[in-house]
């Protein structure tokens, strides 16, 4: 948690927990203070004239005289917590990563169940996704139908991706597996480059956008099928986030014949599961933008352990200052 004027504070993830041994010293000081107060009270009773003591001493000794000591002990406890090095989870933008956006451009994307049609809605949402993705992410674009084509290799140039999205063209058939395998080949090149440079390979993810069932091959477990490609992605450590877009009532006109093109959620859900990714579905442009916003948060940021001791230091300093002020005020109060 983070408190106003204090900063981040946490009671977990301690990096130097052995500092808590200092609390034994703090406890010893507190015990010593109590013993000194008891001894002082005993001396007063032993040597004072009781009649005179009762006439000049207050009926109830002020408890304020103990406040400076209590605050001092509290500040030492707070400083001890700070020295133990508490940490908390901090979300920061990724400096580097590779995301391949793989979009289905088959004829079913002409369906108008999502206005103005599935393709136009997909283009608008994908461009917004590109704009909002954190700058350190390398974004690439692949369009697929019967074959897959790399339109934009991974780059931080968002304009290149958006320009390519505007030029998407419809094509026949749906080879989802081909789209995934093509994305994995692009990522393999990026990974090899990072390893040669002596660095760890950047995290990678495929975002697969489609509305229909794979038609080439018809069996997704075929060596070139979507399920086989998803298993390969998992083996390479590249999760696939799938987005199934459209409604069960979509249709297209082909040769003056109305052909139903219902959205296929189940196939894409299994692709995500097999790859270790997540599956999403959207029935409208607004829902699609919401899905992309969720992905942007997942992909664009990473969670690291951050220092959470600053708040404890500031609070300890504040309590220590109060202890000093209480000591000054205490001199003016009856004891």
UniProtKB/Swiss-Prot annotation:
- Spell out where the chain crosses the membrane: 18-38, 67-87, 309-329
| UniProt xrefs under CDD domains | vWFA
State a GO cellular component annotated for this protein.
plasma membrane
How does this protein sit in the membrane? Multi-pass membrane protein
Leader sequence range is none
Annotated VWFA domain residues: 98-295
List the keywords (alphabetical).
Answer: Cell membrane, Membrane, Transmembrane, Transmembrane helix
Q: Which domain of life is it from?
A: Bacteria
Keyword Transmembrane present in the record's keywords: the answer is yes
Question: Which PROSITE patterns does UniProt cross-reference here?
Answer: VWFA
**What is the predominant subcellular site recorded for this chain?**
membrane
Q: Subcellular location, in the record's words?
A: Cell membrane
Pfam families reported for this sequence: VWA_2
Q: Which InterPro entries match?
A: UPF0353, UPF0353/GerABKA_families, VWF_A, vWFA_dom_sf
Q: Which NCBIfam families match?
A: PRK13685.1
Question: PANTHER family, per this entry?
Answer: LEUCINE ZIPPER PROTEIN 4, SPORE GERMINATION PROTEIN
Q: Which HAMAP family match?
A: UPF0353
The family line of this record is: Belongs to the UPF0353 family.
Q: Could you identify this protein by its name?
A: UPF0353 protein MAV335
């Amino acid at each position: 948690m983070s408190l106003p004027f204090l900063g981040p504070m946490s009671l977990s993830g301690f990096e130097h927990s052995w500092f808590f041994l200092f609390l034994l010293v703090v406890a010893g000081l507190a015990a010593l203070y109590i013993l000194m107060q008891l001894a002082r009270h005993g001396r007063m009773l032993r040597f004072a004239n009781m009649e005179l003591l009762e006439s000049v001493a207050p009926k109830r000794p002020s408890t304020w005289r103990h406040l400076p000591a209590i605050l001092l002990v509290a500040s030492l406890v707070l400083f001890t917590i700070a020295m133990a090095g508490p940490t908390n989870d901090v979300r920061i933008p990724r400096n580097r990563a590779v995301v391949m956006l793989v979009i289905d451009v088959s004829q079913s994307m002409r369906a108008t169940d999502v206005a103005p049609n599935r393709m136009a809605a997909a283009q608008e949402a994908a461009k917004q996704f590109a704009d909002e993705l954190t700058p350190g992410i390398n974004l690439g674009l692949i369009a697929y139908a019967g074959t897959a084509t790399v339109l934009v290799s991974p780059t931080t140039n968002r304009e290149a991706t958006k320009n390519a999205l505007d030029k998407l063209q419809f094509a026949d058939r749906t080879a989802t597996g081909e789209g995934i395998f093509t994305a994995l080949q692009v990522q393999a090149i990026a990974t090899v480059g990072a390893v040669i440079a002596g660095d760890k390979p950047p995290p990678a993810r495929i975002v697969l956008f489609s509305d229909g069932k794979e038609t080439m091959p018809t069996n997704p477990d075929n060596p070139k099928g979507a399920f086989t490609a998803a298993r390969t992605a998992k083996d390479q450590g590249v999760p696939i986030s799938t987005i199934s877009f459209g409604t069960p009532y979509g249709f297209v006109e082909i040769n003056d014949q109305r052909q139903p093109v219902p959205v296929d959620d189940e196939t894409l859900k299994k692709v995500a599961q097999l790859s270790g990714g997540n599956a999403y579905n959207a029935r409208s442009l607004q829902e699609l933008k919401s899905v992309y916003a969720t992905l942007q948060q997942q992909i664009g940021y990473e969670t690291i352990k951050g220092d959470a001791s600053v708040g404890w230091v500031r609070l300890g300093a504040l309590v220590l200052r109060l202890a000093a002020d209480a000591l000054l005020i205490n001199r003016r109060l009856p004891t």
